[in-house]
Amino acid sequence: MASKRTLKRAIHSICEDLFAEAIAVSLYGAKGQQGNAEALLFSILRLEDEFIRRASHIEPGMTAKAYFNSLAEDFRVQVSAVVDQLNS
């Protein structure tokens, strides 16, 4: 990422798309999925908040490149987990 601003916008955009999918599942999915969708909505909001906060402040002792590579990898893992929950 070229800047923190770009990174934050990318995080917001991805979480916004995930949130829209979770809303669709809660409205149009099976009855059993609707209860899980509400918990998933809250987890998506927490995910966005956590990673935008982490993008704002680099951990002391780490180089910026290593920190942001770690941040991107952690975000990919969390997004994959949310997508797996949406698909199940």
Language-model segments: residues:
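Generic structural concept
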Residues: K8, H12-C15, F19, L41-L45, ...
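N-terminal acidic leader/helix
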Residues: A2-K31
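Low-complexity intrinsically disordered segments
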Residues: F42, E50-S88
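Short, solvent-exposed segments of well-ordered alpha helices
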Residues: A2-H12, G35-E38, M62, A66-N69
